[in-house]
Amino acid sequence: VTKMPDFDFMKSREEVFGLDCKPVTWEKAQLLSFSELKPWGWSPRVHNLLKDLKSRCNEQFRESVMSTWSDERKDLYSRRMAATCLTEMVQAIPCLGKDIIPSECNTLAEIRLLSEKENIVVKAPWSSSGKGVLFIPKGEITCKEEEVLSGILRKQGYVMVEKRLNRVLDFAMEFEMDRLFHLNFLGYSVFQTSRRGEYEGNTVASNSSLEGIIAKYTGTGFLREIREQLEKVVTTVFHGKYVGYLGVDMMIYEDESGEFGIQPCVEINLRYNMGIVSIALQRYLRESVEGVFNIHFSPKPGEIMQSVEKNRDMYPLLMEAGQIVSGYINLTPVSRESRFVAELYIGNK
């Protein structure tokens, strides 16, 4: 860290979550040894940021696929890779339907042609969490949108274009690929997004409860078939190329006839993500208790701090036998200068 977190905040969160975290400043980190480095996610910028610490890691990490960055690795993080996995999923489970597979477009003319047929969603190849996404109604692409798309095509080379689906539920399957490239299923994630696909929050609940929410639309058997096939596809595609956490975003949608369908590979996030955070948080809740994890942002000085203080008063944290029963807790320290806070609401909000 660049600055040590507030001591009282760290101590109070250690009491709630039983964690013994020891943040270190950049200066001290240069003097320490590490078994490995596990940032939120890897990118050229993060590799450069941590370059001086790599030599202080053990040999196993220094020789691993995650220790260096190359242009070949860049495509692993693209929407093209998600489309590749989705295509294999549809081939294995034909009832998913080919019309959910995105098209790769290299020119504005190709995008216009698809726009004339139906409502579309256009996505930049390297973007996530609702960023770099344009929703274009059938035949109504604007000059401003064409300008934005031209910029993306110029900088990134292509875009992915898909049919706009009537979204009913956003969810994900969370995994970890170990050093031997075995894929381990961690659990489900049910999350909320804005109309434009930007992340808003996660439901924090037991895995069986989350599976039940999703299975209302898919049936438990079909949902597990999706998971089994996804594990095969992801293992094959990323074997020998990636180690760490990853999440596959999915969607339940309603088609023109009122039937529910599933898009089983909207996006692949090769990093920690909010779903994995939510799975970790659930372990601290009493059995059968559920909550909501979200990120609250405000550009106004003092507003975040005021909101946190209000929530603490309105929803006091209640714990029994070391587990959270109800209430509110901010998961990041706040001050008057804070612009965001990660927070957890437990029980009835």
Q: For the regions a protein language model found, what residue spans apply to each?
A:
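Glycine-rich phosphate-binding loop of ATP-grasp-fold ATP-dependent ligases
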Residues: I100-E104, N119-E146, A172, R195-I214
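Phosphate-binding site of ATP-dependent enzymes
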Residues: E118, C143-E200, M251-C265, N273
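Conserved N-proximal alpha/beta basic substrate-recognition cap immediately N-terminal to
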Residues: K3-L113, S127-S128
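Peripheral (often C-terminal) accessory segments that flank ATP-dependent C-N-forming ligase machineries
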Residues: R286-K349
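A long amphipathic alpha-helix within ATP-dependent nucleotide-binding catalytic cores
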Residues: R154-Q156, K163, F185, E198-F260, ...
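ATP-grasp fold ATP-binding core
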Residues: C105, L114-P137, G151-R167, V248, ...
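ATP-dependent carboxylate/phosphate-activation module, predominantly the ATP-grasp catalytic core
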Residues: F175-K232, N269-H296
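A short catalytic or substrate-binding loop motif that flags glycine-/basic-rich loops and adjacent residues
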Residues: W126-S127, L165-L169, G240-G244, V334-E337
